[in-house]
Amino acid sequence: GIPCGESCVWIPCLTSAIGCSCKSKVCYRN
């Protein structure tokens, strides 16, 4: 539920390396 400061509209979350995932076009962590 914490925004990772990255969008995932066009590309996947690079922050997935630290546990972030794409939700509603924005990368979130928990």
Swiss-Prot record:
Any one biological process term the GO annotation gives: defense response
SUPFAM superfamilies, alphabetized: Cyclotides (SSF57038)
Listed name of the protein: Cycloviolacin-O3
Similarity annotation: Belongs to the cyclotide family. Bracelet subfamily.
Top-rank taxon: Eukaryota
Native organism: Viola odorata (Sweet violet)
Record PTM text: This is a cyclic peptide.
A Pfam short name: Cyclotide
Tissue distribution: Expressed in leaves, petals, petioles, and runners but not in roots (at protein level).
Keyword entries, A-Z: Disulfide bond, Knottin, Plant defense
Cyclopeptide (Gly-Asn) crosslink residues: G1-N30
Signal peptide: none
Keyword Hydrolase attributed: no
Domain notes: The presence of a 'disulfide through disulfide knot' structurally defines this protein as a knottin.
Role summary: Probably participates in a plant defense mechanism.
Positions of disulphide bridges: C4-C20, C8-C22, C13-C27
